[in-house]
C-alpha cells in the first residue's frame, strides 16, 4: 500500500484549487451515504425537487401538446397551391450526351425548320441531352443551358429540365432548371450517419432519431401552419418546444441532467424571442428584402417582420441546445469528480468551461452567417458606398442583427444553465447519472 496521502487522481482538483473528496469514515450512519448521494438534501427534499421538476416539464409538455392541437394546420394550408410550371409544361430529367450540338444535329435541324431560328444561335446556349424521364423520354434533344451552368457543363451531367411546348417557337422546348443531386447529397448523408453512429455509438443513433423527430415537426407542423395563416410567433414557440423536447429527451434520455439542459434551453429561447422582438422593431427590419419574401406576403398574408423574428429563434436552436447540454454535463462531471463541492464552487467551475463556450460561439454563428451571405456581401462591396452604411443596409443588417441576437441568447443561456445544474446536480446520487 502506498504511504503517499495524496491520490494522483486528485491532482486536477488541487490544480484547480478545488477541495478534494474526503474519505468516508467507517462505522454505522444514521442517514444515507454521502459518498454517492446528495450532501445537503435528505431523501424527502430530493423527492420534492424531483416532483417540482416533473411538474415543470409536465406543464411544458402539456402546453406544447395543446399548442400543437390548436395550431395544427388543416386543409387551408397553401402548400402546393402554386403551380411550378406554366399550363401545358412539365418537369423531366435528362443526361448531357455532348456539349457539341453536332451530336444532335437532326433534332436541331427539325426545330429550326419549325421556328426559323438559325442553327448557329442554338450553339450559343444549348447542349445535347438524352431525356430520361418525362415528355419525350428516350429522345436526344438540345437543352437550353445558359450562363454559369453552360460554362460548367460536362458530358454525363444529370439535369432537371422544363418541357414547355410553347418554347418550340423560339428555340428548344427543353430548358435547364437544376442539376440532379440525389447521388452526391445521398452519399454525404450516408457518410455522415455512419460516422455519427461509429463515433458516438448508441448516443449517435439516438441523436439521429431526435433529429428526425425534430425535422418532422418542422416539415409537418411548422411550415404548413405558417402557410395556413397561424400566428408565426405562436407556431415558432410551440414548434421550438416540440423540437427541443424531442432532441433532448430522445437523444440524451430522461434524467435530471437532461431536464436541466432543457430548462436552460427554454430560458435561452425566451430570451432570444424577447431580444428578436425588440431588435426587429428597433432596427426597423421589415423582412421585405427580396422577391421570395414579397411572394410570401402577397400569397400567404404572412407578417414578414414577425416571420423574420421567428427565423432568428429557429436559427439559434441547434447551437443553443448544444451549449446547454454540454454545460449541464460539465457541472455534473465536476460534481462526480468531487461530491464535496458546494453549489457556488460548482457554478464557478462550470462557468470556467462556459467561458470557453462563449469564446467559441462568438465566432461560430458569425462565420456561419458570413459564409451563407458571402455572395450578398461581395455584391454590396461593389458599391461605392461607406462600409458602415453598406453593413447596415437591407439583408446584411438582417444577418448582423440575427447573429447578434442569437449570440446574446447563447451567452445568457450558459450562466442560466450552469446555475440550474449547480443547484440540481446534488439531488441525484453520483452513481445514478
Language-model segments: residues:
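Hydrophobic alpha-helical transmembrane segments of membrane transport and translocation systems
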Residues: 368-370, 374-433
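Cytosolic-side membrane-insertion boundary helix
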Residues: 171-211
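Extracytoplasmic/periplasmic regions of membrane proteins
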Residues: 75-183
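Membrane interfacial helix motifs at helix-loop boundaries and amphipathic/re-entrant anchors
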Residues: 168-181, 223-235, 280-309, 380-403
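Pore-lining and gate-forming transmembrane alpha-helices of multi-pass membrane transport proteins
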Residues: 261-269, 297-314, 360, 364, ...
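Helical hairpin unit composed of two closely spaced alpha helices linked by a short loop
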Residues: 322-384
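Hydrophobic secretory-pathway targeting helix
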Residues: 1-89
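Transmembrane alpha-helical segments that form the functional core of multipass membrane systems
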Residues: 191-194, 202-294, 302-315
Amino acid at each position: 500500500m502506498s504511504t503517499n496521502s495524496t491520490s494522483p487522481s486528485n491532482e486536477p482538483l488541487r490544480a484547480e484549487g478545488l477541495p478534494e473528496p474526503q474519505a468516508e469514515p467507517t462505522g454505522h450512519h444514521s442517514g444515507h451515504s454521502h459518498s454517492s448521494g446528495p450532501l445537503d438534501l435528505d431523501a424527502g427534499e430530493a423527492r420534492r425537487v424531483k416532483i417540482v421538476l416533473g411538474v415543470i416539464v409536465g406543464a411544458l409538455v402539456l402546453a406544447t401538446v395543446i399548442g400543437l392541437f390548436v395550431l395544427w394546420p388543416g386543409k387551408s394550408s397553401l402548400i402546393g397551391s402554386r403551380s411550378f410550371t406554366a399550363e401545358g409544361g412539365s418537369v423531366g430529367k435528362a443526361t448531357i450526351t455532348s456539349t457539341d450540338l453536332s451530336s444532335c444535329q437532326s433534332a436541331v435541324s427539325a426545330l429550326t425548320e419549325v421556328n426559323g431560328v438559325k442553327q448557329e444561335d442554338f450553339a450559343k446556349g444549348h447542349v445535347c441531352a438524352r431525356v430520361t424521364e418525362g415528355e419525350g423520354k428516350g429522345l436526344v434533344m438540345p437543352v437550353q443551358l445558359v450562363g454559369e451552368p453552360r460554362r460548367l457543363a460536362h458530358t454525363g451531367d444529370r439535369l432537371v429540365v422544363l418541357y414547355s411546348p410553347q418554347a418550340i417557337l423560339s428555340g428548344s422546348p427543353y430548358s435547364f432548371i437544376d442539376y440532379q443531386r440525389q447521388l452526391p447529397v445521398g452519399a454525404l448523408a450516408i457518410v455522415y450517419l455512419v460516422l455519427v453512429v461509429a463515433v458516438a455509438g448508441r448516443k449517435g443513433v439516438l441523436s439521429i432519431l431526435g433529429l428526425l423527430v425534430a425535422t418532422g415537426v418542422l416539415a409537418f407542423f411548422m411550415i404548413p401552419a405558417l402557410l395556413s395563416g397561424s400566428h408565426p410567433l405562436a407556431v415558432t414557440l410551440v414548434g421550438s418546444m416540440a423540437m427541443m423536447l424531442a432532441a433532448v429527451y430522445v437523444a440524451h434520455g430522461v434524467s435530471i441532467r437532461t431536464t436541466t439542459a432543457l430548462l436552460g434551453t427554454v430560458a435561452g429561447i425566451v430570451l432570444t424571442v424577447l431580444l428578436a422582438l425588440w431588435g426587429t422593431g428597433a432596427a426597423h427590419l421589415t423582412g421585405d428584402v427580396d422577391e421570395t419574401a414579397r411572394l410570401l406576403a402577397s400569397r400567404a398574408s404572412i407578417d414578414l417582420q414577425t416571420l423574420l423574428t421567428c427565423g432568428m429563434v429557429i436559427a439559434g436552436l441547434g447551437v443553443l441546445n448544444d451549449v446547454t447540454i454540454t454545460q449541464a454535463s460539465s457541472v455534473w462531471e465536476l460534481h462526480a469528480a468531487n461530491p464535496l463541492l458546494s453549489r457556488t464552487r460548482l457554478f464557478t467551475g462550470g462557468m470556467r468551461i462556459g467561458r470557453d463556450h462563449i469564446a467559441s460561439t462568438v465566432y461560430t454563428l458569425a462565420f456561419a452567417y458570413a459564409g451563407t451571405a458571402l455572395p450578398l456581401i461581395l455584391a454590396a462591396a461593389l458599391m461605392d458606398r461607406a462600409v458602415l452604411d453598406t453593413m447596415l443596409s437591407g439583408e446584411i443588417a438582417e444577418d448582423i442583427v440575427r447573429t447578434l441576437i442569437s449570440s446574446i441568447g447563447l451567452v445568457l443561456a450558459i450562466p442560466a444553465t450552469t446555475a440550474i445544474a449547480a443547484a440540481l446536480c446534488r439531488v441525484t446520487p453520483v452513481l445514478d447519472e
